[in-house]
Amino acid sequence: EEDKAALANWRERTGQKEAEAITKAASSRGSQMHNYLESYLLGRENLSFFEDNEQYKKMAKEIIDKGLTNRLEEIWGTECTLYYPEKYAGTADCVGVYEGKETIIDFKQSNKPKKIEYIDSWLLQTAAYSLAHNIVYNSHIDACVILVCTVDNLFQEFKIKGPELITYQNLFLGRLKKFHELSNLNQTLI
């Protein structure tokens, strides 16, 4: 709810038309960056594809150079559809071994630098993916990494692992339980 209120306040301060243009540009840039990163991870592209001067390619290169090179040891999958039986589903950007740990890896673009206290929704999302992967594939994912690049080419890395990851998994499961309770309540009222 706080995220929705903050977004509504931003839209009001910025103006609907300008906010829509910023949102559309960020979404397009993020999709293009994700596509390049996926192609790179699948071996479909080499670094020469960065010779072009487009911003999303520069951002992808920052993530590759500072977040993936010599750190991502195994790729188990890209754009992995994951599900927790009868509960939820989603798509993880990358799953593999990162710095020696079974890891969910998520790529994000941002218009400005992030602080960890502002990315709870991202952390909850990756925690949910780790739960789903562990249940369905009997894996032991014990880390989630979010690799971010801003439009100014500032690279950021956010990690949760061990007890902190378990905390986010439990927070996600709590939200999921509330969602299902509200859904059941709404069904009863209909």
Set out the residue ranges of the language-model regions:
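Metal-dependent nuclease catalytic cores that hydrolyze phosphodiester bonds in DNA/RNA
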Residues: 1-89
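Mg2+/Mn2+-dependent nuclease catalytic core
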Residues: 76-185
